[in-house]
Amino acid sequence: FFVPSEISGGMQKRAGLARAMALDPEILFFDEPSAGLDPISSKLLDDLILSLRDNLNATIVMVTHELASIFAIGSNSVFLDPESKTMIAEGDPKKLLKTSQDERVIKFLSRSKKK
């Protein structure tokens, strides 16, 4: 038996997912789910989120800045312009990386230094 303060951040996140699963949701919302996790734990969490999506047949809505998660989980991503607070692109991130005409989207997805 553990109290929340005694378990790792990754275990706390998995416990949160277990609580959400108990409700058999149609939509799961995640806000920066891998924040504070090491890359291996982040990948495991991404895999768990994908498994939940498939097993629960649930829609996933996720806010993240993690490129690995965007490409692993995102089949339809929305990109927002922080200055105008408007949507600047929407679609599969892998396709947007190749086809977007918006340099901000390309820069974000490639993390390039181009201007």
Annotate each PLM feature.
Residues 39-41:
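Helix N-cap at the start of a conserved alpha-helix in ABC-type nucleotide-binding domains
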Residues 64-65:
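H-loop/switch region of ABC-family ATPase nucleotide-binding domains
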Residues 28-31:
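Catalytic Walker B motif of ABC-type/P-loop ATPase nucleotide-binding domains
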Residues 83-108:
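Conserved beta-strand-loop-alpha-helix hinge in the C-terminal portion
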Residues 3-7, 11:
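Conserved ABC ATPase signature
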Residues 43-55:
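Helical segment within the ABC ATPase nucleotide-binding domain
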Residues 24:
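Conserved catalytic motifs of ABC-family nucleotide-binding domains
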